[in-house]
Curated annotation (Swiss-Prot):
It holds the Pfam family Pribosyltran_N. ATP binds at residues 51-53. Involved in the biosynthesis of the central metabolite phospho-alpha-D-ribosyl-1-pyrophosphate (PRPP) via the transfer of pyrophosphoryl group from ATP to 1-hydroxyl of ribose-5-phosphate (Rib-5-P). SMART domains: Pribosyltran_N. Binds 2 Mg(2+) ions per subunit. Belongs to the ribose-phosphate pyrophosphokinase family. Class I subfamily. This is Ribose-phosphate pyrophosphokinase. Pathway: Metabolic intermediate biosynthesis; 5-phospho-alpha-D-ribose 1-diphosphate biosynthesis; 5-phospho-alpha-D-ribose 1-diphosphate from D-ribose 5-phosphate (route I): step 1/1. Mg(2+) 1 binds at residue 144. The active site is at residue 207. GO terms for biological process: 5-phosphoribose 1-diphosphate biosynthetic process; purine nucleotide biosynthetic process; ribonucleoside monophosphate biosynthetic process. D-ribose 5-phosphate binds at residues 209, 233, 237-241. SUPFAM superfamilies: PRTase-like (SSF53271).
Length: 327
């Protein structure tokens, strides 16, 4: 989004009834979104009692307003989710006209189906909890699987971080590109990414997962020799999947490997894996989840999705199309 676009929002938008409220999960991203739209965050008191209970109070009137709560449900996941639901409840009890939960990263998204007996579908449970808290709409980015949209009994707008990633990659003048899915489940995502990358060829890493957070790569389907391999995934958690894929691509002759993901979950030992020498030329992520300074490494590039989220918020408020942002 350009500065001119932001200025158009400031001049045309009825900001009197548009309110942005930030949780504690990613206040820097919330400030960037506020700057793009041209309004200040509503002040909020958020604290924890001695017994661990959370307390939230909205510090100004939001009666009759269109409220957008900005809160990725990242680590600590349960606290972030609970704080979001408490904020929703506080806004509804304060007579907000509509409350939209802006969730740049949706925690529990990987528990989107049963893979064994007697398991919970926690993504569906999380959606139910949010709806029960009173939220009217959800704006989520790069859900782990598309069917999660259907878990909500309210409107759920799904936006994508790929335009931000692709805009950055296009500045690098890369040649001989092949887009690689780190597993079979990510083929649709990688195919869409490859199409946006000037119809680049696609390769797939066939792997089998032996246990949670453990991945074993087996073989590459497709030609990666002497090419720039772009490994694309929705998130990087412990780094096992993406690093195993990069090692295999190097063995298969890829001249460079670039990892791209929307969500930098970065659970240990992600830092030590991703920062290893001669594995990645670059690791490109967005700021949907805040990356602590202690977890920065030489190859890491963090891109902001604030303008894209700000544009989506504006379009929801103005009842304009969001899908046209990604055509």
């Amino acid at each position: 989004m350009t500065a001119a676009t932001a200025q158009n929002i400031k001049s045309s938008l009825n900001t009197d009834r548009l309110k942005l409220i930030s949780g504690t999960s990613n206040p820097i991203l919330a400030k960037e979104i506020s700057s793009y739209i041209g309004i200040e965050d509503v002040p909020v008191v958020s604290k924890r009692f001695a017994d661990g209970e959370l307390y939230v109070q909205i510090q100004q009137s939001i009666r009759g307003c269109d409220v957008f709560l900005i809160q990725p449900t990242c680590a600590p996941v349960n606290d972030s989710l609970m704080e979001l639901m408490i904020m929703v409840d506080a806004c509804k009890r304060a007579s907000a006209r509509q409350v939209t939960a802006v969730i740049p990263y949706f925690g529990y998204a990987r528990a989107d189906r049963k893979t064994a007996g007697r398991e919970s579908i926690t993504a569906k449970l999380t959606a139910n909890l949010l709806v029960s808290s009173g939220v009217d709409r959800v704006l989520a980015m790069d859900l782990h699987s598309a069917q999660i949209q259907g878990y909500f009994d309210i409107p759920c707008d799904h936006i994508y971080g790929s335009p931000v990633l692709i805009d950055y990659l296009s500045t690098k003048n890369l040649d001989e590109i092949v887009v690689v899915s780190p597993d079979v489940g990510g083929v649709a995502r990688a195919r869409a990414f490859a199409k946006q990358m000037k119809d680049s060829p696609l390769a797939i890493i066939d792997k089998r997962r032996a246990a949670h957070n453990v991945a074993q790569s087996l073989t590459v389907i497709g030609d990666v020799a002497n090419k720039t391999a772009i490994l694309i995934d929705d998130m990087i958690d412990t780094g096992g999947t993406i690093c195993a894929g990069a090692e295999l691509l190097r063995k298969e002759g890829a001249k460079r490997v670039i990892a791209c993901a929307s969500h930098a979950v970065f659970s240990p030992p992600a830092y030590s894996r991703l920062s290893a020498d001669d594995l990645f030329e670059e690791v490109v992520v967005t700021n949907s989840i805040p990356v602590p300074t202690s977890q920065y490494f030489e190859q890491l590039k963090v891109l902001s999705v604030a303008n894209m989220l700000g544009e989506a918020i504006w379009r929801v408020h103005e009842e304009s199309s969001i899908s046209s942002m990604f055509r």
